[in-house]
Structure formats: C-alpha cells, structure tokens
Amino acid sequence: MSKLLEESLKTCPIVKRGEYHYFIHPISDGVPLVEPELLRDVSTRVIKMIDTDVDKIVTAEAMGIPIVTAVSIATDIPYVIMRKREYLLEGEIPVHQETGYSKGELYLNGINKGDKVIILDDVISTGGTLVAIINALKRAGADIKDVLCIIDRGNGQNIVEEKTGYKVKTIVKIEVVDGKVNILE
C-alpha cells in the first residue's frame, strides 16, 4: 500500500497560532497544492476501509469535500455536505458544533429517515465536528454504517465514542512535536 499520505505529512509545514501548532497539509487545508496522486491514494484507501453498501456519504464543509467527491466518483455513492449556513429548506436540521478552535452551527439537508450513510472527514482532533454530524444524522433517522477520518490528531476518537457510541476509523494517527509531524500509526 502506498504511503504517500504519511510521507507528505512528515514534510508539511507547521504554523504556530497562539499555543497551538497547526500542520498545513493539502488534505486538511487544500494548500499549498492538492496533487491528484495524493487525493487518489487517500480515496483508494478510504474505499478499502468503508462499507460501500450505503445510500449516501456525509461530510462537513469544507475540507472533507475533495475527499468525498473523489470517493463518490469512484463508488457512485452520492454525497451530502453539512454546511455552515442555513438554506431554510424543508426538513433542514441545525446542530451546534464545537471544535478546538471554533463554535458554530452546521446544517444538514438531503438525508431521509432510514438512509444508510457513512461519515467521512479530513481530520479528527477534538471530535466536535463528528459529534455534531452524528447528532444531526440521528435526528434525521439515518442509519450510520461507518465513520472515517483521514488524519487522527488528538483524543477525538475516544471523545466521539464516549459521546455517541460510534467508533471512528482513521488512516493515519499523528502528533505535532518540536515543529514537525510524527506518524504514530
């Protein structure tokens, strides 16, 4: 299996904002450049890890979108984006989201009761986004089959499981130490 994702993480820039060290990577930030080879590698690995017998893939705005698009094209599974603004469509479900760096609302549309779904996102750190997505999908009556994040940084997997009962699959677990990304698994 290709390790393009891991190799690209080891060399990505780190930016300090306050006391937090952000890693800047094409999968999590869309900069400096998203290479098709990396997106193909990641989406291929995702497809091998998820239940593809589903009706829809769900992600949150914004950086889950490139990954979900690639997976959708390869599997012919349509996707839904939870947006950061409301559209006032009938049946729209608002849900509060709190992450390690922001708070706000997410809005779910396009999910029907009984839809079999998978959740796919770019990074999990605090778990706040995934908890919000899961809560909205439960309110909609969806059947959540899989939850997967590409990059795991932090304790978010445990938090999501404690708060929702869902296990989060990840491709790679990292930490940022001394200005660089270390691959843990």
Curated annotation (Swiss-Prot):
Keyword terms of this UniProt record: Cytoplasm, Glycosyltransferase, Purine salvage, Transferase
Gene Ontology biological process terms in this record: IMP salvage; purine ribonucleoside salvage
Gene3D superfamilies in alphabetical order: 3.40.50.2020
CC annotations in GO: cytoplasm
EC annotation from Swiss-Prot or TrEMBL: 2.4.2.8
Mutant phenotype after disruption: Increased resistance to the base analog 8-azahypoxanthine.
Industrial or biotech use: Can be used as a counterselectable marker when transforming this organism.
Short name of one Pfam family: Pribosyltran
Family of the protein in this entry: Belongs to the purine/pyrimidine phosphoribosyltransferase family. Archaeal HPRT subfamily.
Purpose of the protein: Catalyzes a salvage reaction resulting in the formation of IMP that is energically less costly than de novo synthesis.
Record's protein name: Hypoxanthine/guanine phosphoribosyltransferase
